[in-house]
C-alpha cells in the first residue's frame, strides 16, 4: 500500500509544535489596517493555535 501524501497547501500554512499543537498565522492581516485599532494590529502579529475540534482534521492533512 502506498504512503499517504501530505497535503502541500496545509503544510505551507500550518506548523506542528513539539507537543502536537498546530500553529498558523492569524487571519485578517493582509490589508485594511486603517479600520483596526492599534491593539488589534499588535495582537494579529503573532501566531494562533488551532482550536481543539479542528486539530484531528489538520493532523490528517499533515500526516503527523
Curated annotation (Swiss-Prot):
Keywords: Ribonucleoprotein, Ribosomal protein. It comes from the Bacteria. GO terms for molecular function: structural constituent of ribosome. The keyword Nucleotide-binding does not apply. InterPro entries: Ribosomal_bL35, Ribosomal_bL35-like, Ribosomal_bL35_CS, Ribosomal_bL35_sf. One of its GO terms (biological process) is translation. The keyword Ribonucleoprotein applies. One of its GO terms (cellular component) is cytosolic large ribosomal subunit. PANTHER family: 54S RIBOSOMAL PROTEIN BL35M (PTHR33343), LARGE RIBOSOMAL SUBUNIT PROTEIN BL35M (PTHR33343:SF1). Belongs to the bacterial ribosomal protein bL35 family. This is Large ribosomal subunit protein bL35.
